[in-house]
Amino acid sequence: MTSKQRGRPRSFDRPTALEQATMAFWEHGYETTSVSDLTRVMGISAPSLYAAFGDKKTLFEEVVEEYARSYGAFGGRAFAEEPTARSAIGRMLREAAVEYTDPAHPRGCLMISAAINCSTPEVEEDLRTRRNANISAFEARIRRDVESGELPADTDAHALARFSGAVLQGMSQQARDGAGRPELEALAETAMLAWPVTGTRAGRGSVSPAGPGISPETPAGRGA
């Protein structure tokens, strides 16, 4: 007599399943994306999800890490490749206009939109910490440029960093509300006009975000 096989784990491609989970959280947010939603879009059973990723919160944590390494990595690249805060943040905002409106994935930034109406304190706190870490990186780079003379001595680094973070977060919400790439690019250019004129170094008098720009204090690994 042959025994019937039971409980055999379903075979699936883990990276593909993780990508599908990313799309679900990005589109609908953490709170409103249920485990049943996740198993449906990932094409796996609930036991397979728990075995491979843990619970919903640990899956989301992995999604956020992967997002920071992929879709959200443009901010870190700008800070790693540009010589000044002005050009790094200007580039980051321009690239956000492209990334946030890319039709290949949900609009806006996952780390911003996924936190809306989130009632899970640990998730909300983690996303807030990541966003604030980005602003701290902006401020550190701005302060370096003030010290080097790239920006005027009376530049309010804290306020300018907060302003830049607010613009980035606002661009994400604008994209979610239907703003197109040209509108967000115009917003980015306008935001850079608020920066003080360049100090004693190269690019004197320029308010364009297209100049040189960045530093080791980068938002890389936290996403933009």
Regions found by a protein language model. Give the residues of each.
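N-terminal intrinsically disordered/low-complexity leader segments
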Residues: 1-12, 155, 199-224
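Helix-turn-helix
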Residues: 2, 16, 20, 24-58, ...
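Short coil/turn segments at alpha/beta junctions that flank glycine-rich nucleotide-binding fingerprints
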Residues: 28-31, 82, 148
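Hydrophobic alpha-helical connector segments
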Residues: 62, 76-107, 157-164
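Short, basic, alpha-helical segments at the C-terminal edge of helix-turn-helix-like DNA-binding modules
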Residues: 65-71
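Amphipathic alpha-helical packing segments from all-alpha helical-bundle domains
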Residues: 72, 90, 121-148, 158-159
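Amphipathic C-terminal alpha-helical segment
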Residues: 99, 144, 164-182, 193-203
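Hydrophobic alpha-helical segments that form the core
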Residues: 107-117, 155-174, 186-194
